């Protein structure tokens, strides 16, 4: 269904968590080896030959997954240590109550809470919501990215060591090709923009 309907508009819909066709939902299948990245790459190219930007954006995400694996291969400490070592000296907060509220989807921030509850119920969360929830943990609650990384590892059905580690370092600002550490996702504005319902 995604190849027929969602792929052509992937570049427009991939950041909209409320749309069923906005993502391929292939990440668990990739993680468990039911399908390979090469198969996904070639099938997406063949399934929608004339969709242009949708296929290009989708294949770009497949490449990001492979880039994370490449990064982990060359930096095996990725799950434990930031690539930008200065981040090891950040004075992270140890707040078990705030961390538990985040894990349970009880922060009071609708987009974060909906995503975290979805994660607990389904073992999956939309990528945009993963970024918002991750940014909230590290940049609003000031809780160490490793704690979020460990929670996602324990709860995601598509938990991939390379992607999980690289993504947490990206959202924190301490990884390779990261967003700037000073960029903070405003979870309220993100919710209004990407999932107003």
Regions found by a protein language model. Give the residues of each.
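Long hydrophobic alpha-helical segments that form multi-pass transmembrane helix bundles
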Residues: 1-7
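C-terminal catalytic domain of photolyase/cryptochrome flavoproteins
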Residues: 8-197
């Amino acid at each position: 269904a995604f190849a027929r309907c969602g792929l052509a508009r992937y570049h427009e819909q991939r950041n909209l968590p409320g749309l069923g066709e906005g993502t391929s939902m292939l990440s668990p299948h990739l993680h468990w080896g039911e399908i390979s990245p090469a198969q996904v790459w070639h099938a997406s190219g063949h399934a929608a030959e004339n969709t242009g930007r949708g296929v290009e954006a989708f294949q770009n995400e497949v490449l990001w997954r492979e880039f994370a694996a490449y990064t982990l291969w060359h930096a095996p400490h990725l799950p434990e240590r930031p690539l930008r070592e200065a981040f090891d000296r950040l004075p992270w907060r140890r707040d078990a109550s705030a961390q538990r509220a985040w894990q349970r989807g009880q922060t009071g921030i609708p987009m974060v809470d909906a995503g975290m509850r979805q994660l607990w119920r389904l073992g999956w969360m939309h990528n945009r919501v993963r970024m918002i929830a991750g940014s909230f943990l590290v940049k609003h609650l000031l809780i160490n990215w490793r704690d979020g990384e460990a929670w996602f590892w324990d709860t995601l059905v598509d938990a991939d060591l390379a992607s999980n580690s690289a993504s947490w370092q990206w959202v924190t600002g301490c990884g390779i090709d990261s967003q700037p550490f000073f960029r903070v996702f405003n979870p309220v504005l993100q919710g209004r923009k990407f999932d107003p319902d």
